[in-house]
């Protein structure tokens, strides 16, 4: 079905999924696609460290591509320090420097396999609470992010990582009031301090951390104004309507949309989703 939709589209489509391994396995959890679920990054590391992680990534990419998917919303490059932390089981659990090394090699491997990677969750979850169920506030100083959380993202950016997903954590050292996904300053840090020129996307705007902060459709408008190129939402209809309305009312400058579209098209070209003949200038 995805192949049919891809062939019917004038401009190639991005089809993405979360296939991290462990607790987040949107595809391999179904027996029709794989006999067993992909194991968590930490389980794979214990089996064979980095070589095993890269081989596991290749298997994931092969499976996803076989059913028409071209983006995996992975890897999780957060650096929690406590095994009790919400994000710990989804992370490598190996500290900032090792996570940075793994991230670099994994991004390169996914690119070689023509699978779009998405590093997450910028600016770093740390040991914070689950934003699926409420607002998480990070009180750590900015210097901590510079010496720990940012390292894997920097490593992945240097390796050519095409996408970064931004969390809904409120990080007080960057923005005291807004979730990171809706914060202009957090996006400024990503663009200017980390020199990232690729695609920036939100975590799901239907998550409770956002819903308890701002009304449904308004979240998407704030996300665009903050600097996101792509928006993820399991409740996308009202989000889309509010964005269109904001453009019509001049709340969102068309230039913002155009810049995002150019980045998305550039990535699609780089990953063979479209070729330049498909684009009318």
Regions found by a protein language model. Name each.
Residues 248-276:
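Mid-to-C-terminal alpha-helical segments outside catalytic/metal-binding sites
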